[in-house]
Amino acid sequence: MKLVIGLGNPESKYSGTRHNVGFDVIDRLSESFQIPFTAGKGKYHFAKINWRNTAIVLLKPMTYMNLSGHAVVAAMNFYKIQRQDILVICDDLNLPSGTLRLRAKGSAGGQNGLKHIIECLGNDEFARMRVGIRLEDQPLSSFSSFVLGKFSEDEKKTMEKILPVCADAALDFSVNGIEHAMNHYNKPAA
């Protein structure tokens, strides 16, 4: 069994924001399998899907981004899932909009949801998919209001192209592992 976690903030006012791109990827998977989310045994919503003989739990923490680790640990304990079987999907202000980057492990890189998961798990040895949200003309100093802002119409078009790729990469991770997914979905920056 694999656990694929999309990071975001639970209130409807955050829907469509750059910070909720992890939720967007997970929602895309849930919709494509026509499996709705239900409340879990912790502060999370989940949907269970099967793909190529692999059970996959899709998870949306309902704890807010900065406390995501609590929901992740609760789900890992409930489903008895090990670190090597999780993939965390989040936004990344350091990557250009419309790109993705898979890694087997690594630092939080300024992403507070990842930071809290690392704190709760005690190390950074879990797979993650970072989805780029940075605009070319966006100064990195004003990141807080930017990440919590809604996508512009142009950004929405870009996201509509990358979200299915992210969903496919999450399925690839689930069936074939992080190295395979990295080899197929990590592309050099243009």
Swiss-Prot record:
Subcellular location, record wording: Cytoplasm
Any GO BP: protein quality control for misfolded or incompletely synthesized proteins
Positions bound to tRNA: 14, 64, 66, 112
Family annotation (InterPro entries): Pept_tRNA_hydro, Pept_tRNA_hydro_CS, Pept_tRNA_hydro_sf
Catalysed reactions, semicolon-separated: an N-acyl-L-alpha-aminoacyl-tRNA + H2O = an N-acyl-L-amino acid + a tRNA + H(+)
Keyword tags: Cytoplasm, Hydrolase, RNA-binding, tRNA-binding
Coiled-coil zones: none
Catalytic residues, chain numbering: 19 (proton acceptor)
The UniProt record lists the keyword RNA-binding: yes
Site (Stabilizes the basic form of H active site to accept a proton): 91
Top-rank taxon: Bacteria
MF terms (GO), sorted A to Z: peptidyl-tRNA hydrolase activity; tRNA binding
GO cellular component: cytoplasm
Sites annotated Discriminates between blocked and unblocked aminoacyl-tRNA: 9
The protein's assembly and partners: Monomer.
Family in the record: Belongs to the PTH family.
Protein name per its UniProtKB record: Peptidyl-tRNA hydrolase
Species in which this protein is naturally found: Chlorobium limicola (strain DSM 245 / NBRC 103803 / 6330)
Gene name of the record: pth
